[in-house]
Amino acid sequence: MSAAFQPPLMMMQRPLGSSTAFSIDSLIGNPPQPSPGHFVYTGYPMFMPYRPVVLPPPPPPPPSLSQATLQSTLSSAHHHHPIPSLPGGFCSSLAQGMALTSTLMATLPGGFSASTQHQEAARKFGAQSLHGAFEKSDGSQSDGEEGNKTYITKEGTLLPFSASEASLGPVRGQGKEESGKEAEGKGKEDSYLMDSDLDYSSDDNISCQTAHKEEDTPEESPQNSNPSNNSNTSSTGKNRRRRTAFTSEQLLELEKEFHCKKYLSLTERSQIAHVLKLSEVQVKIWFQNRRAKWKRVKAGNTNSKTGEPSRNPKIVVPIPVHVNRFAIRSQHQQLEQARP
């Protein structure tokens, strides 16, 4: 019975060859060409770069004898630490490199007995370098790049990309909600400014709340406290502010106040708005329009918008055609000469 079990025991003692002399070269075998994605074992106990370097995904390694023998060693002597078949990227190359170094140190007799410490150091280094690389590349990655990406957590376990994205989801959701609130606040301020601070020196903004409309308007509810509600869509598709229908009593009071004072203070505006049951914005816009019309009347150009002749034109005396202009000039010259 002992003779039957002796060849497997011999194979367990010397799994990598039949040579009696032990060396690192016999462990490694014929080393393959170093692929650009893997860590290359250089004979040191640990290959630790100072900065986390994001390496390109490794090509499929050639099926060589050394890797097959390494995996056989791994399955026979080191069951609790298999090489994870990761889908590629920086994490897979990092994990494979760490697994290779840990298995090599575990199979070396004597000198490297504390392989568990190196495994813990490898796990910690993998987690730290991974978190650093993730913080650097998080700004450049878009949300649409959801591939089969895995991450190593602090405990050494592999976390899929979707789980880490779900953990980051509430933070990003709060940021989106805050940006949405800011955008809504800016939109309200812009609409308020567009309604209140128009260019009242031009004629296009003069609405029906001008002074000289003494005819009675249909009494609609003039209480439009929100200036954002004053905008509706006309048939042409343009957003246009709805004109406020003032009553004759409101127009009369506004005219009286305007003749007394062209510019109102904030307290006066609030008092007038409270008495006339209007909003302060409506009183402000009415006074701005009224001042613009008053300045145009003062300048002598009332209806320049429609192209009609003004109501108070400058008096121009035309010269009749049948009058000889030379005779008029000669008469003026004679009169000037007759003066002393």
From Swiss-Prot:
Pfam families: Homeodomain
Start-end of Basic and acidic residues biased regions: 174-191
DNA-binding region coordinates: 239-298
Taxonomy, superkingdom: Eukaryota
Signal peptide: none
Keyword DNA-binding in record: yes
Ranges of biased composition (kind: Low complexity): 65-76, 220-236
Protein name: Homeobox protein GBX-2
Record flagged with keyword Transcription: yes
UniProt cross-references to Gene3D superfamilies, sorted A to Z: Homeodomain-like (1.10.10.60)
Disulfide bridge map: none
Region (Disordered): 58-81, 154-196, 211-243
Cell compartment(s), UniProt: Nucleus
Gene that encodes the chain: gbx2
Purpose of the protein: May act as a transcription factor for cell pluripotency and differentiation in the embryo.
Record keywords: DNA-binding, Homeobox, Nucleus, Transcription, Transcription regulation
UniProt organism field: Xenopus laevis
GO cellular component: nucleoplasm; nucleus
